[in-house]
């Protein structure tokens, strides 16, 4: 079966990852000891996408957990699902990366990376037909961003033809955790542009807004934010894990969503939004799901899709519903909001339907969109980067770990190029596109 190997790095990545496994275990009927206690044979049919079957009928997550300090790992081990992971798959150092990308990428992280790769190799060898990797990390800190991108580039070398999907938590515009976030994020994006296939962009502030505005939580905790992220992560991969009428996998998703190889940063959304522990009290309809899913307030990153245009988008519906109704709704959205879709990619919205809804809901939908408005996030980080880099503020923390200023300059210009590319396709029209092609043909004569 098409297995996915899950890797989580750094504090943020490990906390999101731990939540994700709780959600997946719930969907597949696996309890906290790894024993199956589910009700439907469909839960087991493709359970090996995310689990290895060990002796005694236990299911063990295909997960690699890494960090440069033991803290988060220990709290996962002590948590509700701590006993389910393979003990050898916890790989951690003692020193920490101190929010320093260079430590994660070049010094501390580089010392630990081989032991992580050994575990990854062992897990990959256990797979029948490995489909790809999913990495959870944040881009603002040191470990998830520095060591995370180091691992991604090493995996890229070793498994060049496997899909690399990342769930990357961007620094938020208003909620800043550390002052050097813009440096760490820019250096990471520089790597992700080259080495990842698909990046799902998340950001804490947008998640806070959703908790606050939509879920009416007065002071949301990281647990609440991670609950939203894990719902989306589960939605993106449900087609691989359960039977459905219109299935898709990571590669199909990429083929449908990425018109140009560098533009692989996606906005994600989820519907229906419910807070932890509250059940849905009324049945949903496909039109309601569609409406909520496309709503700008529903996006999990701080960019407004109304400020740009969608190059492509994909919607994954879950639950018992009519495929015809789904298709009608999607066409309806495109017709009503045609100005928000580029006209030079016809039929640029793909939908898939999976029969099994998430636990506690009758139906749900996950949205993944490739919108040019995501440049707002890159632009914002880039401006903060430039403001500090111009004065060479905090640079000594990086140069003392052996980094060169040149690398910063390259990362900065790569980020600016990315913003310019998004802008270029946002402004492009179908007529222009035809003219360019004609010019090209004339040159070849």
Swiss-Prot record:
Q: In which residues is Mg(2+) bound?
A: 69
Q: Which UniProt keywords apply?
A: Cytoplasm, Cytoskeleton, GTP-binding, Magnesium, Metal-binding, Microtubule, Nucleotide-binding
Cofactor(s) the protein requires to work: Mg(2+)
Q: Which CDD domains match?
A: beta_tubulin
Under InterPro entries, the record lists:
Beta-tubulin_BS, Beta_tubulin, Tub_FtsZ_C, Tubulin, Tubulin/FtsZ-like_C, Tubulin/FtsZ_2-layer-sand-dom, Tubulin/FtsZ_GTPase_sf, Tubulin_C
Q: Name one GO cellular component term.
A: microtubule
Q: Record's SUPFAM superfamilies?
A: Tubulin C-terminal domain-like, Tubulin nucleotide-binding domain-like
Give the source's domain of life in one word.
Answer: Eukaryota
List, alphabetically, the PROSITE patterns matched: TUBULIN (PS00227), TUBULIN_B_AUTOREG (PS00228)
Q: What is its main location?
A: cytoplasm
* Annotated GTP binding sites: 11, 69, 138, 142-144, 204, 226
Q: Where does it live in the cell?
A: Cytoplasm, Cytoskeleton
Give residue spans, biased composition: Acidic residues: 429-445
Which Gene Ontology molecular function entries are recorded, alphabetically? GTP binding; GTPase activity; metal ion binding; structural constituent of cytoskeleton
Give me any GO biological process, just one.
Answer: mitotic cell cycle
What Gene3D superfamilies does UniProt report for this protein, alphabetically? Helix hairpin bin, Tubulin/FtsZ, C-terminal domain, Tubulin/FtsZ, GTPase domain
Residue span of region Disordered? 425-445
Regarding protein family, the annotation reads: Belongs to the tubulin family.
Q: What does this protein do?
A: Tubulin is the major constituent of microtubules, a cylinder consisting of laterally associated linear protofilaments composed of alpha- and beta-tubulin heterodimers. Microtubules grow by the addition of GTP-tubulin dimers to the microtubule end, where a stabilizing cap forms. Below the cap, tubulin dimers are in GDP-bound state, owing to GTPase activity of alpha-tubulin.
SUBUNIT field: Dimer of alpha and beta chains. A typical microtubule is a hollow water-filled tube with an outer diameter of 25 nm and an inner diameter of 15 nM. Alpha-beta heterodimers associate head-to-tail to form protofilaments running lengthwise along the microtubule wall with the beta-tubulin subunit facing the microtubule plus end conferring a structural polarity. Microtubules usually have 13 protofilaments but different protofilament numbers can be found in some organisms and specialized cells.
**What is the protein name given in its UniProt record?**
Tubulin beta-3 chain
Q: Where does this protein come from, organism-wise?
A: Zea mays
Chain's gene name:
TUBB3
């Amino acid at each position: 079966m098409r297995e996915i190997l899950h890797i989580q790095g750094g504090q943020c990545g490990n906390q999101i990852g731990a939540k994700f496994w709780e959600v997946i275990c719930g969907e597949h009927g696996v309890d906290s000891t790894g024993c199956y206690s589910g009700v439907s044979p469909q839960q087991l049919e493709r359970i090996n996408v995310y689990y290895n079957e060990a002796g005694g009928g236990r299911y063990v997550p295909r997960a690699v957990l890494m960090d440069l300090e033991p803290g988060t790992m220990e709290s996962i081990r002590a948590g509700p699902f701590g006993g389910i992971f393979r003990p050898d798959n916890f790989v951690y150092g003692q020193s920490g990366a101190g929010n320093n990308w260079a430590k994660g990428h070049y010094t501390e992280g580089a010392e630990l990376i081989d032991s992580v790769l050994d575990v990854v190799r062992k897990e990959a060898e256990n797979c029948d037909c490995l489909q790809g990797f999913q990495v959870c990390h944040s881009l603002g800190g040191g470990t998830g961003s520095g060591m995370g991108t180091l691992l991604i580039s090493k995996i890229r070398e070793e498994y060049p033809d496997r899909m690399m999907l990342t769930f990357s938590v961007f620094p938020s515009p208003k909620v800043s955790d550390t002052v050097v976030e813009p440096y760490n994020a820019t250096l990471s994006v520089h790597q992700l542009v080259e080495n990842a296939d698909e990046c799902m962009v998340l950001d804490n502030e947008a998640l806070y807004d959703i908790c606050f505005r939509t879920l009416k939580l007065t002071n949301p905790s990281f647990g609440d934010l991670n609950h939203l992220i894990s719902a989306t992560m589960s939605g993106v991969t449900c087609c691989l894990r359960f039977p459905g009428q219109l299935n898709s996998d990571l590669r199909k998703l990429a083929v449908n969503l990425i018109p140009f190889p560098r533009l692989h940063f996606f906005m994600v959304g989820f519907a229906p939004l419910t807070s932890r522990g509250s059940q849905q009290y009324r049945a949903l309809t496909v039109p309601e799901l569609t409406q909520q899913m496309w709503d700008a307030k529903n996006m999990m990153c701080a960019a407004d899709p109304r400020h740009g245009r969608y190059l492509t988008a994909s919607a994954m519906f879950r639950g018992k519903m009519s495929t015809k109704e789904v298709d009608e709704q999607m066409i309806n959205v495109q017709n009503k909001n045609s100005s928000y879709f580029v006209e030079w990619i016809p039929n640029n919205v793909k939908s898939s339907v999976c029969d099994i809804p998430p636990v506690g809901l009758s139906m749900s939908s996950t949205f993944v969109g490739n919108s040019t408005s995501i440049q707002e996030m890159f632009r914002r980080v880039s401006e903060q980067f430039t403001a500090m880099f111009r004065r060479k503020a905090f640079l000594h923390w990086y140069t003392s770990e052996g980094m060169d200023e040149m690398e910063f300059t390259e990362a900065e210009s790569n980020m600016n190029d990315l913003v310019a590319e998004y802008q270029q396709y946002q402004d492009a029209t179908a007529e222009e596109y035809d003219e360019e092609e004609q010019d090209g043909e004339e040159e070849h004569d």
